[in-house]
A protein has these predicted regions:
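A short beta-strand-loop structural module common to alpha/beta enzyme folds
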Residues: 29-40
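Secretory-pathway luminal glycosyltransferase catalytic domains
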Residues: 40-202, 298, 305
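Donor-binding and catalytic core of enzymes assembling or modifying cell-surface/extracellular glycoconjugates
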Residues: 197-289
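A short, glycine/small-residue-rich beta-strand->loop->alpha-helix junction that serves as a flexible
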Residues: 6-15
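Short amphipathic alpha-helix
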Residues: 16-23
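Leloir-type glycosyltransferase catalytic cores
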Residues: 287-309
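Extreme N-terminal starter segment of soluble prokaryotic enzymes
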Residues: 1-3
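Short, aromatic/basic amphipathic alpha-helical patches
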Residues: 41-57, 214-229, 291-298
Length: 309
C-alpha cells in the first residue's frame, strides 16, 4: 500500500496525488490519502470535497490514532527535483510506504494519465465547467480562447526563489500563439454558408489572485493597447469570486494556455484536452536561490518563451 504527505497549494498537491495513484496502478497495489482539511504545513486547504471529491473512497479519516500511524510510516523521500523512478514492488510491503516530496514531472504518471483522469472524472468536470460558462462572452462569437495566468502576490518577497514574470513575457507568449494558430481555425461559417474570418479572433481570459488585481489590470490595459493585439484580441478578467479549483478547470477548457511560473497554471494547461493546444511557459521558472534542474518539468510539446526583460 502507498500513501503520500500532502504539502503545498493545489498544483503541488496534484503532483503528489497523481504520483501516488500512478505508482499504485503501475504496481497493482492499493493507496490511500489522509483526509485532512489542510496540508502538512496547516497553511493550505486540501481539495477532497471539491476537485478531488471522486477520490473520497480512497481517503482515511484523520483521527488522532490514524494520524499517529501515518506519521510513523516508512518514508520514500524524493532525492532531487528531476524525475527519479519510484519504488516498483510496493505491493509486497507489509507496511504502507509514504511518499514525501513534490514529484514535479509528468514522467511520474504520464503512462497512466487517462486512468487517473477517469478516477477524478476530469471529463465530467470539464463538461460541468463548460455548462457553467456556456453563455459567457468568453466563449462566444467563434473566437478562440487563451488562458493567461499571472502569479505575483506571494512571490513579491521571495523573488530570489520565485521571480515575478515581466509583462514582456506575456507579450511574447501571446504573440507566439496568435502568430501560429492555423488560419483555418480562425474561420467560421456565416448565414449564407460561406466561411468568414472575424475581426476578433481571440478571447484572452486573465487569471490572477485578488491581491494582484491592480498590477494585472495595468498589464491588461498595456496588452489591449498593443497594436498587434488591439484588433485581434478581447481581454477578460476572470472574477476573483470563483474558487481556485474552478479557475483551474476553466483554464483547462480554453484552447491555449500561457502559464506563469506556477504549478497552478501548469495543471490548468496539463488538464487541457485540446489536441491542438499551444502551451507557453517561462524560461525562468525559479530564481537564482533555487538551482533546480527543470528539464523534466515540462512536456516536450510545450513552448519555452524568454521571460527575461
Amino acid at each position: 500500500m502507498i500513501t503520500v504527505l500532502i504539502n503545498g497549494g493545489l498544483g503541488n498537491q496534484l503532483f503528489q496525488v497523481f504520483a501516488t495513484l500512478a505508482t499504485a496502478i503501475r504496481n497493482e497495489d492499493t493507496c490511500y490519502f489522509m483526509h485532512m482539511p489542510r496540508d502538512a504545513t496547516g497553511k493550505r486547504t486540501t481539495y477532497w470535497k471539491s476537485l478531488l471529491h471522486n477520490l473520497m473512497p480512497l481517503t482515511v479519516i484523520s483521527t488522532p490514532s490514524n494520524v499517529q500511524r501515518f506519521m510513523r510510516l516508512p518514508v520514500h523521500q524524493e532525492t532531487g527535483f528531476r524525475y527519479t523512478k519510484l519504488p516498483s514492488k510496493t505491493a509486497m510491503n507489509s507496511t504502507p510506504l509514504k511518499l514525501v516530496g513534490y514529484f514535479q514531472s509528468d514522467k511520474y504518471f504520464a503512462d497512466v494519465r487517462d486512468e487517473i483522469y477517469a478516477k477524478i472524472q476530469l471529463i465530467e468536470q470539464h463538461d460541468g465547467i463548460k455548462t457553467m460558462f456556456q453563455d459567457s462572452a468568453w466563449f462566444s462569437g467563434g473566437a478562440m480562447t487563451i488562458a493567461m495566468h499571472f502569479r505575483i502576490g506571494d512571490y513579491a518577497q521571495i523573488q530570489d526563489a520565485h521571480p515575478i514574470l515581466p509583462l514582456e513575457y506575456y507579450r511574447r507568449a501571446l504573440h507566439h500563439i496568435v502568430s501560429n494558430v492555423p488560419s483555418a481555425d480562425l474561420y467560421k461559417p456565416n448565414d449564407d454558408g460561406n466561411d468568414v474570418i472575424t475581426d476578433v479572433k481571440f478571447n484572452v481570459l486573465i487569471f490572477n489572485q485578488a491581491c494582484d488585481d491592480e498590477v494585472v489590470l495595468e498589464h491588461m490595459r498595456a496588452l489591449k493597447a498593443d497594436p498587434e493585439f488591439a484588433k485581434r484580441c478581447r481581454f477578460y478578467k476572470v472574477p476573483d469570486m470563483f474558487e481556485d479549483w474552478k479557475q483551474m478547470l476553466l483554464m483547462s477548457v480554453c484552447a491555449h494556455n500561457i502559464i506563469a511560473n506556477s504549478t497552478f497554471s501548469w495543471w490548468g494547461a496539463y488538464f487541457n484536452q485540446n489536441p491542438g493546444k499551444m502551451v507557453c511557459y517561462p524560461s525562468a521558472w525559479f530564481g537564482p536561490a533555487l538551482k533546480h534542474d527543470t528539464r523534466d518539468l515540462f512536456p516536450a510539446d510545450w513552448v519555452k518563451i524568454n521571460s527575461l526583460i
